[in-house]
């Protein structure tokens, strides 16, 4: 490929609304162009990266036995009404009507459509297992699209869906996809972690996220450096930091804490460690009658240590809270505690509440909590003596760096990541909702066991740049760079020798199957080099009259600090060797 035949449009400055590095660099490198809020044109340079990402995904999905199809972007609402998601999903689901006033959706995902295909086509156990995948445009009407393609409204994803006859077979399909994903991300050349995750809105029983490591990542990844344990912050298990509850050494006392409504302020006032304090969080659950009105409200008091934070995903797994919860209103808090938020605690309640203690709090002795009176806290509180044991003890907090690893193999560390892939074992959630059955050996209908497996194709680009960039531009791994090698001739339009050498190298590398760009635009060396460093081509060869007279050319890897000289006659072999290493 020659630059004069391609489209290159770089910018010296990023647009003012580009907040993160990936957005800034993709705009400057001419890879994307904004069309509307969260909607981008993928320009030729960016599209080349997308196609390389897709090619790797296709190769590994096919290798794993998945079969490609293509499902539509516009889907009839009837299928989504079967699963209830047409009404359950919020405004992120773009709903439209056709000229006949029929409801459709612009797909954010395709569980309903693929399950409809399966229930029509996969009728016998002999046809199972089966795994369908597609690479397709999606749309989610994000309330606040930002960060360029990292949180856009229109994007491209690879979605795969497995169908199996039983849970054991489905687990094998899940494992096959998990292994395929590891091969895919290994080939991308990115640093990543596969972490256990919550199943979220999609539902199911087993889930892993594939996170690209980046300091700017929105997700917290928890892992143990000395074992294989890894999970996202929502799922990472927080063990009790106290092995056994100690004996009481203090009497409970009501202590003035004027104007100190946070655990940190109270600990500072009393000159005690923050870990001695306990914070109170008040939730509520509502039971509805047949008319849909609230028939009964239960108030819950959740207790976590003062230096810890509540984990809402874990809270949602506590018995009594699984059906959903909300934060209690100020009126509900005052009626049960006789006090406004800021000084709440489990002692001296006006009305009974359900008390859930985090594992660590349940083992604490001589702790500090609100006195249910403005400007007062209680010190020296002990379970059993000053208040009953909690109604339940559960893991309801986020882990923190340095916590013991749940597998007992060390301590936990936390790093930031960008989710680019997710695998779910769905079970029969969708097959039951849509009556997707097959006939077993005895001719009896059985619900298919399902899994779903997604990769954010366009999101990969942003995540890769967030992980790999420097002051000059993007640092693409070889496998997904728009071009692998760029030949930069100085004086291409003035020197016959330079032109001949550049053309010959370009042709030889291209014949060897290497994705090579020859910059024949006649740009000044500084501007030419700056463009390709910004775009992030991994390997650069510079050919000049001066070098050729000495029988040499210059080679520089994008991550190399300086260029090295290579005999002109050996440069093609040298570059091929670098690509193999």
Swiss-Prot record:
Superkingdom of origin organism: Bacteria
Compartments, as annotated in UniProt: Cytoplasm
One function term, GO molecular function aspect: proline-tRNA ligase activity
A biological-process GO annotation: prolyl-tRNA aminoacylation
One Pfam family here: tRNA_edit
Domain-related comment: Consists of three domains: the N-terminal catalytic domain, the editing domain and the C-terminal anticodon-binding domain.
Protein name per the record: Proline--tRNA ligase
Organism: Leptothrix cholodnii (strain ATCC 51168 / LMG 8142 / SP-6) (Leptothrix discophora (strain SP-6))
Gene: proS
